[in-house]
Amino acid sequence: MSDNPPRMEVCPYCKKPFKRLKSHLPYCKMIGPTIPTDQKVYQSKPATLPRAKKMKGPIKDLIKAKGKELETENEERNSKLVVDKPEQTVKTFPLPAVGLERAATTKADKDIKNPIQPSFKMLKNTKPMTTFQEETKAQFYASEKTSPKRELAKDLPKSGESRCNPSEAGASLLVGSIEPSLSNQDRKYSSTLPNDVQTTSGDLKLDKIDPQRQELLVKLLDVPTGDCHISPKNVSDGVKRVRTLLSNERDSKGRDHLSGVPTDVTVTETPEKNTESLILSLKMSSLGKIQVMEKQEKGLTLGVETCGSKGNAEKSMSATEKQERTVMSHGCENFNTRDSVTGKESQGERPHLSLFIPRETTYQFHSVSQSSSQSLASLATTFLQEKKAEAQNHHCVPDVKALMESPEGQLSLEPKSDSQFQASHTGCQSPLCSAQRHTPQSPFTNHAAAAGRKTLRSCMGLEWFPELYPGYLGLGVLPGKPQCWNAMTQKPQLISPQGERLSQVSLLERSSTHIRSLEPPAGLTTSNFSLMRLLGAVQKGWIRCNTTIRKSGFGGITMLFTGYFVLCCSWSFRRLKKLCRPLPWKSTVPPCIGVAKTTGDCRSKTCLD
């Protein structure tokens, strides 16, 4: 028996040989099987687990990151809203209506694209206590000052579960007493809501206060039922719907006022939210006068008045001018009649934009908002073409005065008749120079000043000396002989009240002559100038252009004195021509040298001159 080795038995659980298997079996049963019988199933699980973790990991990270971003954005926006309107009774709270829902694992691809699906739910029996008195005013402020997400809440379609009145739903949406859909967010947002909002009251019902005040709430919340998932398209549609309803409400109240009901609606929008926001105030009085004042942060303002009664036109104009001067400190544009404009011109003051209106339409003020759609270049070209056509019909060139303005503003141009041009154009010859001297320095006048300087530099030295035109034409210095100048040299010249002679040659025609090609001189003609008359003309011209020549630059001054030098030489050359008749003009020797060599009498006579 000792030769036979002891029999070894294999444990069915741990697969190990034991001499005493019975003593080992209870211990192995308690531990459990290390390698189960279905080894294939357990070997396939470690291969699938990492894949599931890889798919769920980024989804969880995206959901957490975007949830934190939404919370921080909501807190910042709501804190700004509370700081912007501390005196108002309507309180804004963080949006508790945003609920993060995870999709099922079978839709993994859709969850990666849209991991967050906000759901808005309302409680069934919520009747919040409100502290404001006028619901319509609160609705205006809330609709204008809230962010796009809060405007989404206003255009929210009612879910099938909540069966509450539109007025109660609107009140709960305005105050912000919407609870989240998930239970873990109930704990988070329950501390942020105050006690007066969480408490419910059975006595207070907003739909019984005033049906007229609740019209806007019913209009805003009158939307079809549907699911609570909202897309960016629904966001833009909701914003447009709120704004159109507000504009319709404002228009209906304006029509009610015209029938005899006085109303006063003020809509304000915070400039911090939008830098290019407008502040519109509609003030309606019993006289039928409507003042539309539009302010913008860029400094562009416009005051337009339409008066119902023509008798009170002048008084209302003076009142609004004073109000605009006090309220709008920069960038204002005053619309005045011809009498006020001429009174200010006599004192040396001219408004920023002068609007000359004919007598037939003195008390009729038309809106100039339609001209903003047209471009500035098209208006200027059409205006110049009309002026040229009128000049060809009347055989004269009238004054061209173009008022330039920024494209965001308005453009108002009206031509002046010939009598108005002759009456108003008596102080200075150049209209652009007068506009530069009398109008204040602003970006509006910088463009006109630059254009005026260019035209003045090209024709400086001609418009200030009308007595010298025959000399220029006789010498052939000018590039061609315009018909207008030949006719003007024979016409009697205008005389101003100060005793000065004014030129009738227009500024536009003088500048256009420089573009023409040069022609050979037609020959020297006799002139009736004397030395004293020439010096007198130079002195008068210098006195006229002394005030504006400083801004013209160096080129205009050199051209001016070059013209004077040529005229003086032509005068002396004509005198020599009369004395030197025997000499042939086709000789190569200059006439002055020939006179000095041939005869001493002629030389003595020239020295005496």
Swiss-Prot record:
Protein keywords: Membrane, Mitochondrion, Mitochondrion inner membrane, Mitochondrion nucleoid, Transmembrane, Transmembrane helix
Q: Where is this region: Disordered?
A: 142-168, 183-202, 410-441
Where does it localize? Mitochondrion inner membrane; Mitochondrion matrix, Mitochondrion nucleoid
Q: What GO cellular component is one of the record's annotations?
A: mitochondrial nucleoid
Polar residues: which segments have biased composition? Answer: 418-441
Task: Give the Basic and acidic residues compositional bias ranges.
Answer: 146-161
Q: How does it sit in the membrane?
A: Single-pass type I membrane protein
Segments on the Mitochondrial matrix face: 1-552
Name this protein carries in UniProt: Mitochondrial nucleoid-associated protein 1
List the taxonomic lineage.
Eukaryota, Metazoa, Chordata, Craniata, Vertebrata
Q: Which gene encodes it?
A: MTNAP1
